[in-house]
Amino acid sequence: KEFGFDGVVVSDWGAVKHRAKSLKAGIDLAMPYSADYGKQLADWYEKGLIDEGDLDRSVGRLRELAEKYRSAVSRRRVTMTEEQKHELAVRAAEESAVLLKNDDDILPVCKDKKIAVIGGFAENPEFQGGGSSRVNAKVSQSLCDCLKNLGFNVDFALGYMIRYNILTPFGIRYAVETAAKNDCAVVCVGNTWLTEKEETDRFSLKLNSAAEDLILDVAQVNPNVIVVIYAGSAVDVSAFEGKVKAILYMGYCGEGANEAAADLISGRVSPCGKLAETFPKSLEDTATADRRGNGYSERYPEGVLVGYKYYEYSGIAPAYPFGYGLSYTCLLYTSPSPRDRTR
């Protein structure tokens, strides 16, 4: 009533504990379906705790939504081909990726350089989180193939296996040998959907130890390491940030992830993405550092100081602030002078 909203109110999945009480509170559609919901409504109706008016109002809103949907579907015209949709997915990934670090302008990589691509995510990228967000992509290419298509000489090494959705060390020696004989090494790491999903919180901002150890091992034999991160939220990169030349944060950017990564690494596209959240230096710098939850519930005593506002208010310097993102463009300002615009 306060917001003037007259549409359908839908619950989050599994959020309704009592269907009849939720109906009185304004929930029209409780998800997912449960046969117990009907029993609760019938029981409360027989007891006089809800009436026909409560039911009719809710059903009326649902019918109105169904009519609007049917009308919208009849007017919908899909004009994009599958190829055009994929091109859009690649462009969205290119414009969403964030370049966090680029020392000595290691990126973009020249085509005469030999590249070692290391990590299972290079072959099978994790481009979405777990839970209701997961979809089956129609197209997914390996980073090696994408770089080869752009004319690069590429060697691949696994470096780790993804077993039960956990990164496990595998073929470290071969990965290090491969990195040593190439001009630069692109190490692809990140979090699997088991770590980044709905219903639970992460217990750490760090990457899996197998990923961090792989980066450090490769950095010992090759001074030109480029780390590509596939993850759904902030990552603590302090363990390897000082050992590598570049960090490219791809996030979870859909089916075009590796094509976009190749375009960014090659310089075919210049990075333009900006962070949508602050990346702290460590978990201890966050507002939740002193109140580790149980993974399923959380309190927010910081009030309105959620996210980047907390760091500004507390004076804690983050690793990468909200809105941060590098590009391949260099700007130089010299001798600025004010102009009188009153004339």
Protein language model features and the residues they cover:
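C-terminal non-catalytic regions of proteins with extracellular/luminal or membrane-system context
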Residues: K1-D6, V10-R19, Y37-I50, E87-S335, ...
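A short alpha/beta connector and helix-capping loop motif
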Residues: A20-Y33
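Long, well-ordered, tryptophan-enriched scaffold segments
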Residues: G26, Q40, Y45-A72
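Generic alpha-helical segment signature
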Residues: Y33-S34, L55, A89
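Short coil/turn segments at secondary-structure boundaries
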Residues: D54-S58, V73-V78, P108-K111, T278
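Helix-enriched interaction subdomains in cytosolic or periplasmic regions
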Residues: E67-E95
